[in-house]
C-alpha cells in the first residue's frame, strides 16, 4: 500500500508518498540487484532485477504501488536470452508504442559475454515477432595467449523504433605487450533487422583506445557517443572523457567540436551522457590531489562550449572520497541536472545524488547543500518522471561486503 507523507519533504529527500515511504521493496531479499528502470505508459515504472541468472521484469504504478497486471505470472516476467545461461540486464528502453526493449548480455563467462537484445509487449509478455538478437563475439577466435573482455552494452531508441546499440571489446595479451580497446556502434530497424547500410561502426575517440558509456541523438538526428579514451603516456594509463558525433548515416560529423571529437583536458573517467533539447550534458569523475570529484559539462549541439553553463567551465564538485562513480544523469523539466551514482572509500560504498542548476551551479536547496549521501549501497540507473517530476533510482541498499537489498527509490524533486 502506498504511504502518504504528513509534511512536505525537501527536494532531494525520499518522497514518502512513493511506494512504501519512498522505497519499492522488491521481493527476493538479498538475492537480486536492481539494474535499470524506465518510465512506461501512464507514468508507470518498469524495472529489471538481476536475480538467479535471470532478468526479472516488474511494473509499478506511477506512485510506486505494484501493478499485478504486468508480466507472465504474478506481476513478473522472468527472462534469459539463452536457456540455462546467465542473462545480465543493462538498460531498459520504452518505445513510443509502449513496447519495451531490454539490452543486456548473455554467457557463462563473467567478462567475455555476447550482447543481447529482446523486446516485450506493453503488458510484459515477450514479443515473439521481434524475438531475441544475440550478437557474435567481436573477436572470434580469440588469439592464443590473449584475453577478450566485453563491456556492458547500452542503447537508444528513436521515435520511429530504430535502435542504436553500443558495445565494444578489450583485447589484451597475457604478457602485456598488446592492448586494443574499441567501441562498436550498430543500428537495427523497428523490426529488429540490422541496418546493413549503417553497418558496424568502430568508435575510437581521436583514434585512441576507447570505451562507450552512453549514446543519444540530437534533434537533427545526429548521433552522439560518449565514453572515454585512454592515451597511454610513458607506459601509464591516461583516461579522459570523450565524445564523438556521427551523421544519421553513421559518418563522422567533422563539424562537431574538433574534427568530430571532443575530449576532456584532464584525467577523467566513468560517467553518463544525455542529450536534452539541443544540449549535450554529461558527467564524469576526476581525481584531484587524491580526492574524488564529480565533473559536469554541457556543450552546444555543434560540440562547442556552452558559456551559459558555469561560464563555459566544467562544474567540479568535491565529494570528499577517493573514488566517485557517476551512474546516471537526468534532466528535469526546469532544466536542472540530477547526477547520481556511488562513492567508494576503502571499505564503504555509498549512494549519492546531487543537483546542478541550469546555469551550472550546485543547487544548495537540494538535499544537504546540494548533495544527498543517502546510504550504503550501489546505484545503477536513474530517471525523472515526466508528469510528477519525481526522481527515480534503481539501487541496492546494504554494506559493501554483506547483504544488499534491491530497491527502486523515489526522491522529491
Model regions: which residues?
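Extracytoplasmic mature domains of secreted or surface-exposed proteins
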Residues: 1-413
Amino acid at each position: 500500500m502506498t504511504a502518504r507523507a504528513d509534511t512536505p519533504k525537501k527536494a532531494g529527500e525520499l518522497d514518502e508518498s512513493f511506494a512504501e515511504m519512498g522505497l519499492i521493496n522488491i521481493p527476493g531479499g538479498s538475492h537480486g540487484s536492481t539494474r535499470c528502470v524506465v518510465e512506461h505508459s501512464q507514468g508507470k515504472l518498469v524495472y529489471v532485477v538481476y536475480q538467479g541468472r535471470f532478468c526479472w521484469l516488474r511494473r509499478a504504478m506511477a506512485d510506486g504501488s505494484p501493478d499485478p497486471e504486468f508480466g507472465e505470472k504474478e506481476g513478473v516476467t522472468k527472462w534469459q536470452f539463452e536457456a540455462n545461461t546467465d542473462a545480465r540486464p543493462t538498460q531498459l528502453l520504452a518505445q513510443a508504442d509502449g513496447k519495451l526493449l531490454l539490452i543486456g548480455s548473455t554467457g557463462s563467462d563473467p567478462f567475455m559475454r555476447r550482447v543481447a537484445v529482446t523486446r516485450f509487449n506493453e503488458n510484459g509478455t515477450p514479443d515473439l515477432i521481434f524475438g531475441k538478437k544475440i550478437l557474435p563475439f567481436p573477436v572470434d577466435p580469440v588469439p592464443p595467449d590473449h584475453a577478450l573482455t566485453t563491456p556492458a552494452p547500452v542503447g537508444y531508441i528513436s521515435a520511429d523504433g530504430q535502435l542504436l546499440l553500443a558495445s565494444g571489446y578489450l583485447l589484451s595479451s597475457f604478457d602485456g605487450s598488446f592492448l586494443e580497446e574499441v567501441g562498436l556502434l550498430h543500428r537495427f530497424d523497428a523490426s529488429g533487422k540490422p541496418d546493413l547500410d549503417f553497418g558496424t561502426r568502430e568508435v575510437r575517440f581521436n583514434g585512441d583506445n576507447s570505451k562507450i558509456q552512453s549514446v543519444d541523438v540530437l534533434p537533427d538526428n545526429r548521433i552522439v557517443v560518449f565514453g572515454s579514451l585512454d592515451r597511454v603516456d610513458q607506459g601509464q594509463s591516461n583516461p579522459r572523457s570523450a565524445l564523438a558525433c556521427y551523421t544519421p548515416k553513421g559518418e563522422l560529423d567533422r563539424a562537431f567540436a574538433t574534427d568530430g571529437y571532443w575530449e576532456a583536458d584532464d584525467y577523467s573517467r566513468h560517467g553518463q551522457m544525455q542529450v536534452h533539447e539541443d544540449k549535450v550534458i554529461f558527467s564524469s569523475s576526476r581525481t584531484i590531489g587524491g580526492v574524488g570529484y564529480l565533473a559536469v559539462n554541457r556543450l552546444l549541439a555543434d560540440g562547442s562550449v556552452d558559456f551559459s553553463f558555469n561560464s563555459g567551465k566544467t562544474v567540479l564538485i568535491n565529494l570528499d572520497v577517493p573514488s566517485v562513480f557517476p551512474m546516471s544523469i537526468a534532466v528535469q523539466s526546469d532544466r536542472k541536472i540530477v547526477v547520481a551514482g556511488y562513492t567508494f572509500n576503502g571499505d564503504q560504498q555509498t549512494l549519492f545524488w546531487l543537483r546542478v542548476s541550469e546555469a551550472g551551479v550546485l543547487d544548495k536547496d537540494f538535499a544537504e547543500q546540494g548533495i544527498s549521501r543517502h546510504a550504503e549501497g550501489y546505484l545503477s540507473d536513474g530517471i525523472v518522471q515526466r508528469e510528477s517530476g519525481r526522481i527515480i533510482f534503481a539501487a541496492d541498499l546494504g554494506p559493501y561486503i554483506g547483504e544488499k537489498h534491491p530497491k527502486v527509490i523515489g526522491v522529491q524533486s
